[in-house]
């Protein structure tokens, strides 16, 4: 049939359009445009019917799936026998897992371990066990900072609606379901390798054998991600291809017929998917292998495009939410790009040339997705893949698999093998982290405008088509357009005339970002931070939570900010400077500004030492100084000299004018400090007050409010914080003076956006803000 080869690809594209249109209705217009292009290009009625049917099917499928994605439970305390649905993860004194209720609803459960002895006992809990659990249901947190990971949305797309804070685990019985037997085997391999492997090897070997990256060090994993080689630590088509080809060869050599070998492999693949964690890349590779094997059984020669389109459609039929997963998108985008460009590889005769083309096309195919989800890519991703892919394929991957098999046969020989293998892994990890540490290799782009991203994706497709046709004229035109769009994506923030002030929701602490129009000044005032206490060794976490890593750096990255023009620290309390070292070590700061007398204790010196090590200029300021940071100007109102009796009253107090409004930023200033500011500046006024010390009763005096006459007060405080900030007396005072109050603990990140001295307050995450959004 004419154009028959287009049926499955067009059906897959229409399925994508249907799900996207159901989730984001304006996408329906793109589908109409898509149908018009098919009509003009092919005039093939049957193809249009197939596309339309696929679109309607997946539109309805997503709508029905989403409407049924609700919970039958309410917030409160529940006790019943639940099934442990995943391998429990123990990190320090916390155990986390998914549990399944008697009516098959799944929850994200977490348990605080009480003692080292209990921790040892919990290691024996297996997936599939039924345990009597008692705990409280709480709603998962939404992302309250732009760019940060949205845990609520992540769970929602797994049909999970609750966090279950478990207080008691009792009477666990053995699993019976076969699926859980496979998961128990996976857990056994993880525990087995944890106990016998050297630290550097453990995480890498587990990632390559069972698809678990939990024990890969955070620094190493981040480095792999920055350089665009993190796919090496995922079970992918390469692993599945090598495994199926190897097993097929062994079975043929053992005298098993090709048909029986294919059937055995078809039975084996689902087990392998469960054993390796069922990540999108594994599902895609296993399904494609299954299509090839099934085709061989019925004497049907399956084309690669057919296999990948069938796999894509089947996965979306089972779970349309897959479409919105970064891993799913990357796996299929790269595979589609390589399959559609297969004729290019055949024209290149040398292995090095083919490796170069494969790396280049994979990079091009993944680039729009990388920019959308992660806002950055490495310019040396192609050469790094050319170097690392063969090395992992022929050395690290076989070594990891062989080492685990050897370890299971003989612990002594296995340890001997891993003693040298660990040296190799350590050397590779150091190489990767050192290269990733070179900032010049990373290109960072602000969250792309949808129109520019769509245009960029289209130009990449046209560029790949031009490469395949070997048309120099088309290649020059599409390559030029592609580079132009890429350049526009890169400079887009510099073209924007919008400025901003953001009070970032970092819990019980302070962190404010001030950005001038056209990126002419990017300043962070304080970093927030969590109080750390010394604890027993068994409570120490392998992956401790970091506001800098999980909140501030993603926030800056989403804005395309590779480096701040200045980091201003108001005073040396942990909840204001706790993440400064992380920002400095990630090369995020050009200039560090501190108040006079910043160091009052030996521990306060740590931040300054980190700045010196990174070559960051340190500037000490006092009352009367004016900070000029490109187009941003800050007037220093306090301190004149440090207050030996109070760190809070030694806070750096700043006054600025931006977006047509005057702002006073008070750090943790208390009433005594406020009085001193009024004495020195008796005519000081401010439209916006950043309330001192998170709204404690020791700050924000009546005289200060009467003097400033603010219209808006911003309070940064943690949700349900132990200090009960902000204090009711402060809130009542602000209410008496008819001052609008915006709070991070209730509203999330508080945003002020302005153009030409006219601005608007809003909050993140956005919702009906008619009561707080107001144009200046």
From Swiss-Prot:
The keyword Cell division does not apply. The keyword Membrane applies. The chain crosses the membrane at residues 19-39, 45-65, 232-252, 263-283, 308-328, 352-372, 387-407, 416-436, 443-463, 475-495. InterPro entries: ComA-like_MBL, ComEC_N, Competence_ComEC/Rec2, Competence_DNA_uptake, DUF4131, Metallo-B-lactamas, RibonucZ/Hydroxyglut_hydro. GO terms for cellular component: plasma membrane. Induction: Expression activated by ComK. It is found in: Cell membrane. Disruption phenotype: Destabilization of ComFA. Keywords: Cell membrane, Competence, Membrane, Transmembrane, Transmembrane helix, Transport. It holds the Pfam family DUF4131. Its main location: membrane. It is a multi-pass membrane protein. CDD domains: ComA-like_MBL-fold. One of its GO terms (biological process) is establishment of competence for transformation. It comes from the Bacteria. NCBIfam families: ComEC_N-term, ComEC_Rec2. The comE operon is required for the binding and uptake of transforming DNA. ComEC is required for internalization but is dispensable for DNA binding. To H.influenzae REC2, N.gonorrhoeae ComA and E.coli YcaI. PANTHER family: DNA INTERNALIZATION/COMPETENCE PROTEIN COMEC/REC2 (PTHR30619), RECOMBINATION PROTEIN 2 (PTHR30619:SF1). This is ComE operon protein 3. It comes from Bacillus subtilis (strain 168). The lineage of its organism: Bacteria, Bacillati, Bacillota, Bacilli, Bacillales.
